[in-house]
A protein has these predicted regions:
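Hydrophobic alpha-helical segments typical of transmembrane helices
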Residues: 6, 18-21, 50, 94
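A short gly/proline-enriched turn/hairpin at secondary-structure junctions
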Residues: 31-41, 57
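A beta-strand edge to alpha-helix "cap/lid" segment located at domain peripheries
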Residues: 2, 48, 52-129
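Solvent-exposed, amphipathic alpha-helical segments
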Residues: 5-13
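Short alpha-helical functional segments enriched in proximate histidine and acidic residues
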Residues: 13, 25, 54-57
Length: 129
């Protein structure tokens, strides 16, 4: 699987709030760091557990992924997400730093993001190279 296909699958799993589909994108021993200073979620079980927790408060999720920037097994992908989180409309914008194995499974993910209140649209040319 190439990085663009992986990113689309990640976005679909988020929109569908599907922890199993998300976990399937990762290696058995993957590291998923959702907060850079916290310990990572480890393996598919860790990803599944994390996604089950965070998506439980989300609704009306819309995700747009930017065009990946790829350098060998490493990639960076921006995301722009609007949703209801705990009943409040929010926009979540960020970047995923990813490392992949030879089969296109993600071995590591580090996530950097910011929240804003309300549903905001991306600026012109967002996510393009």
């Amino acid at each position: 699987m190439d990085v663009a296909t992986w990113a689309k699958s990640y976005a679909r799993a988020w929109v569908e709030m599907d922890p199993e589909a998300a976990a399937d994108l990762f290696t058995d021993d993957a590291s998923y760091r959702s907060f850079i200073f916290d310990e990572p979620h480890i393996g598919r079980d860790g990803v599944r557990s994390y996604w089950s927790e965070v998506t439980s408060t989300q609704a009306e999720v819309q995700v747009t992924m930017g065009r990946p920037i790829v350098d060998g097994p490493r990639a960076a992908v921006e995301f722009w997400t609007t949703m209801e989180n705990s009943g409040e409309e929010v926009t979540l914008v960020g970047c995923l730093l990813l490392t992949f194995d030879d089969d296109g499974q993600c071995r590591s993910l580090s996530e950097y993001y910011e929240f804003a209140e309300g549903r905001l649209d991306p600026p012109a040319a967002w996510g393009a190279l």
